[in-house]
Amino acid sequence: QEKLPYSEIPIAANEFTPGTTASRLIDGLGFRYYWTTEGLKEIDLVYKPNAAARSSEETIDHILGLSQVILNATLKVKNGQKQPEMTFVEKRKKTLENLHQASKTLRFSNDISQYKMIFGAKELPFWNVINGPIADAIWHVGQVVSFRRSSGNPINPKINHLSGTIKE
């Protein structure tokens, strides 16, 4: 099986810069997403707390879209492309790869103000990437954690979110 990014959080940068800080924020999201979605079963994916709510898989679809917006900002490309149909495994892989690529770009950037969210002719500064899709994705990862606990499949208790590692 192919090794996906974020089974552990990458080693932190040696210095604090806007780029390394934004990168680390995305790395934290990637690590949480990796372990939140690891070992999900069909019963977890279809779970929703009530008829009006999104299912776990619909929430994962939304997180995939958010990861694409984050990546597109770092690629300096417009948003609005439709995702192809994918299996859960493919969505998970694509989301993790999107986050990893965006993080790497930001980590080595001296000027993150060059990265903007582009919707048609409208450009929004990187601040909006932070309080928009990054914050929203973190929020929704928490929802999937709650949903999988409710469907009887809690996340691995050996995850150490502070250190970004798995306890032995």
Features from the language model and the residues they span:
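Bacterial Sec-dependent N-terminal signal peptides
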Residues: 1-5
